[in-house]
Structures are given as structure tokens and as C-alpha cells.
Regions:
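Conserved N-terminal entry element of GNAT/NAT acetyltransferase domains
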Residues: 2-8, 99-134
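Asp-based phosphoryl-transfer active-site loop
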Residues: 7-20
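Short amphipathic alpha-helix that is part of the acyltransferase structural core
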Residues: 25, 128, 133-151
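Conserved Lys-Pro-Asp/Glu-containing loop-to-beta segment of HAD-superfamily phosphomonoesterases
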Residues: 44-66
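Acidic, Mg2+-coordinating phosphoryl-transfer loop and its flanking beta/alpha structural elements
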Residues: 60-91
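Structural recognition of alpha->loop->beta junctions
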Residues: 88-104
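Conserved GNAT-fold acetyl-CoA-binding loop/helix
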Residues: 148-170, 177-179
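Conserved small/polar residues in nucleotide/adenosyl-binding loops
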Residues: 185-186
Length: 188
């Protein structure tokens, strides 16, 4: 089962001010994805509808910084298209120079990172491997309390300090490196 079927995902992809060649590549990469609607915005005014929509249903792609800023203001995940060899730098959840490799899994990952949803790395009938989230902290402390757990590695900080450390780690490292500390859950 594809990754994007597992959790929340963007139900609409809004696109504005992206070259037609790049839009064609994106459509090609998303061919066969039935659960997501592709919305090609013709006018900037169309974007103001976002404030009336449920932002968790949308991911926005644009090369216009003022529209990307509007997306941020209404809590919509956004991908900036940065034209290659351009001197200006756009700000968004993710910046791309082309859509050759942008597929639904990529969009899903940007969407999840925006809404702080931990990535599922692997799922089988017997286990799930996903990024650590703050709700795992109690289990982490239980695991580290086992005999021999810290014989060859550092232990955890005190609970509140570890909580702050993990918050900062998730906020900064997950976004910067594209992955984070993983958690393994045995299902059977």
C-alpha cells in the first residue's frame, strides 16, 4: 500500500505561477493518484479562498513569495519553485528547482513535516518503524531504565530537560536533515 494512503494527506494541490513544463512533470508524477485534486490557480485572487478552506486539506506550490507568505499565514504547507540560477531565495516548507522527482510521497512528507506528523519509515504486519514523537517519552524512559541499557552509551537527561531536548531536536533536526530519531513498535 502506498505511503500516502496510511495517514492524513493533502486532498488538494494548489499550483500558482509555476512554468507549464514543471506543471506537466508534476501531473505526470501524480498520474493515477485519485484521492488528490489538482487545482491550477489562474489569478492571485483565487488564493484568498484559502482562508475559507480547511488548510489541512491543501498543499500549495508557487514561485511567488507573497503567495507563499500567505500560505504560511493561514497554516498551509507550501513548496516554493525556485527557478534554477536565480539570485533570489524563496522561503517555504520546502524549496525545489524542478518537479522531476516530486511525487505523492514527497508531497506527503512535506505535508507531514509542516503539521509535525512523525514519518512512518517502515510498516509490516509485525512492526512499525517511525520517527520518535514526544508522546513516546515515557516509553523511552522505561526502556532506558532497563539494566545494562546505558553501559555503553549515555543515558537520558532528567524528564523535563529531556522533553525540551527532544522538542528542539524534532523541530530543528527533523526539518534540516529530513529524518529523525526512530521508534520501533512490535505489533505481535
Amino acid at each position: 500500500m502506498p505511503y500516502y494512503n496510511k495517514k492524513e494527506y493533502p486532498k488538494q494541490i494548489w499550483v500558482s505561477q509555476i512554468p507549464e513544463r514543471e506543471v506537466s512533470l508534476l501531473r505526470e508524477n501524480l498520474a493515477g493518484i485519485k484521492q488528490t485534486t489538482f487545482v491550477l490557480m489562474k489569478k492571485e485572487e483565487d488564493f484568498h479562498q484559502l482562508s475559507e478552506k480547511r488548510s489541512r486539506d491543501i498543499i500549495f506550490l508557487s514561485s511567488n513569495q507573497s503567495l507563499l507568505d500567505l500560505a504560511r499565514d493561514v497554516d498551509v504547507p507550501a513548496i516554493a519553485y525556485q527557478k534554477p540560477e536565480t539570485d533570489t531565495f524563496l522561503h517555504a516548507d520546502m524549496v525545489v528547482e524542478g518537479f522531476e522527482e516530486v511525487d505523492m510521497t514527497f508531497l506527503q512528507r512535506v505535508y507531514e513535516r509542516h503539521f509535525n506528523i512523525p514519518w512512518t519509515i517502515l510498516e509490516t504486519e509485525r512492526c512499525i518503524v517511525r520517527e520518535l514523537e514526544l508522546s513516546d517519552l515515557d516509553d523511552l524512559f522505561s526502556m532506558y531504565a532497563e539494566p545494562g541499557m546505558t553501559d555503553y552509551m549515555e543515558g537520558l537527561y532528567e524528564y523535563e530537560e529531556e522533553l525540551e531536548y527532544q522538542k528542539a531536536y524534532i523541530e530543528n533536526m527533523y526539518r534540516f536533515y529530513g529524518y529523525g530519531t526512530v521508534s520501533y513498535t512490535h505489533l505481535r
